Design a protein with these regions (language model features):
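Juxtamembrane helix-loop boundary signature in multi-pass membrane transporters
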Residues: 1-11, 105-162, 277-312
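Glycine-/small-residue-enriched transmembrane alpha-helix faces in small-molecule transporters
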Residues: 1-40, 75, 83, 146-173, ...
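Helix-helix packing/entry segments at the starts of transmembrane helices
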Residues: 8, 14, 40, 96-102, ...
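Specific transmembrane alpha-helical segments of multi-pass solute transporters/efflux pumps
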Residues: 16-21, 53-100, 136, 223-241
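Membrane-interface helix-cap regions at the ends of transmembrane helices
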Residues: 19, 26, 45-63, 132-147, ...
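Hydrophobic/aromatic residues within transmembrane alpha-helices
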Residues: 27, 37, 41, 87, ...
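C-terminal transmembrane-helix exit sites in multi-pass transporters
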Residues: 48, 53-54, 103-128, 255-275
C-alpha cells in the first residue's frame, strides 16, 4: 500500500508540474520575464509551505549540516530550471525538452554506479518507452524533427537534466534529508531556489513588479499547484518508491502540458503526438506494475532453479 501511494504521489507530482504553462503563459503575455516569474513562484510557494508548517506546528529549526544540504538541493533545483531556460535560446523547445527528459537515465546511472542499484528489465523498458513518448510529444514544439542546436545549448540542457537527477538521488540517499519532515525539506529547498533566482534576476534587470491582479492570481496558482503540491508529492514519491521509478513517472509532465494546450489554448493533437501519449501511458503502467512483475519473474526463476535438471 505504501508503494501504491508512492506511485500516486509520483503521478501527482509530474501531472501538476505539467500545469506550468497554464499559469506561466498568461503572465508572460503581460510582459513578465521568466526570471521574475520563477522568483515569485518560489517565494510565494515558500510562504504557503511556511503557513502549513505553522498550522501543523512543524519545527522550523535546522542544523548547520542539514542547512548545507538543503541549500545544495536548492541550487540543483534552481540549476535545472535556469539551465533549461538558457538552452531554449540555443535550440528548439522540442529538442530541449527531449534532451532534458533524459534525466531518468541519469538517475539510473547514478544509482547503479554510486549505490550499486541495478534497474530491473521492466524499468529499463519503461525508460525507453517514456523517452520515446516524450520525444514524439516534443516534436510539436519544434515543427517536426527539424531544428539545429549549438554545442553549448546541448551541454546546457544535459546539465539541466543532470542537475535534476542529482536532486532526485540526493533526496532519497542522504539520511539527514530522507528523515527530514517533508514540509521542512520543501520549505528550505524552495527558499534556497528563490534566493538563487533572485541573484540571477539581479543581473538581468531585477525582479519586475506584478503588473495586474490577474497576474497575481496566476502567480499564486503557479506557486500552489505546480510548485507546492508538485514538490511535496515529489518528495513523498521519492521516499516511497525511490529516485529511479519517480524519475520515470516524470514523463507525465509533458503529457499534462499537451492536454492543457489542447483544452485551454486550442492546440491540436497529431498522430505522432497520439503515439507519444500512448507510449507514456504504457511506460507509466509498466512502472506501476513493475514491483508485481519483478516479483513474479523472480518467483518463476526460483522455481525453475529448484527443478531437477532432467525435468527442465
Amino acid at each position: 500500500m505504501n508503494k501504491f501511494k508512492g506511485f500516486l504521489y509520483g503521478m501527482t507530482a509530474s501531472a501538476t508540474f505539467g500545469l506550468l504553462p497554464l499559469f506561466t503563459l498568461p503572465t508572460m503575455a503581460e510582459g513578465m520575464t521568466t526570471d521574475s516569474i520563477l522568483c515569485y513562484r518560489m517565494l510565494f510557494a515558500s510562504l504557503l509551505v511556511a503557513v502549513l508548517m505553522m498550522v501543523r506546528r512543524v519545527n522550523f529549526s535546522v542544523g548547520v549540516r542539514e542547512l548545507s544540504w538543503l541549500v545544495l538541493l536548492g541550487f540543483f533545483y534552481y540549476g535545472s530550471a535556469a539551465l533549461l531556460f538558457q538552452a531554449y535560446g540555443s535550440m528548439s523547445s522540442g529538442m530541449a525538452t527531449t534532451l532534458h527528459f533524459l534525466y531518468p537515465v541519469g538517475v539510473t546511472l547514478i544509482m547503479a554506479v554510486l549505490f550499486k542499484q541495478r534497474p530491473s528489465p521492466f524499468t529499463i523498458i519503461a525508460i525507453i518507452l517514456a523517452l520515446s513518448g516524450v520525444a514524439l510529444l516534443s516534436l510539436r514544439g519544434s515543427g517536426g524533427a527539424e531544428g539545429s542546436a549549438s554545442l553549448v545549448g546541448i551541454l546546457l540542457v544535459l546539465l539541466s537534466g543532470l542537475s535534476y537527477a542529482i536532486y532526485l538521488v540526493t533526496v532519497n540517499n542522504v539520511r539527514r534529508i530522507r528523515e527530514m519532515d517533508n514540509l521542512k525539506l520543501t520549505l528550505y529547498v524552495l527558499l534556497s531556489s528563490a534566493g538563487f533566482f533572485l541573484i540571477n534576476a539581479s543581473f538581468n534587470g531585477g525582479v519586475q513588479a506584478i503588473p495586474s491582479g490577474a497576474a497575481l492570481v496566476n502567480l499564486l496558482l503557479l506557486a500552489f499547484l505546480p510548485t507546492l503540491v508538485s514538490n511535496l508529492s515529489l518528495v513523498r514519491a521519492i521516499k516511497s518508491i525511490g529516485s529511479t521509478l519517480t524519475s520515470v513517472l516524470g514523463a507525465m509532465e509533458p503529457l499534462t502540458a499537451i492536454v492543457i494546450g489542447v483544452v485551454v489554448f486550442g492546440e491540436t493533437i497529431s498522430g505522432t503526438m497520439a503515439l507519444g501519449i500512448l507510449l507514456i501511458i504504457v511506460a507509466v503502467t509498466i512502472i506501476v506494475l513493475s514491483p508485481l512483475l519483478d516479483k513474479n519473474i523472480a518467483e518463476r526463476l526460483r522455481r525453475f532453479a529448484q527443478r531437477p535438471i532432467g525435468r527442465r
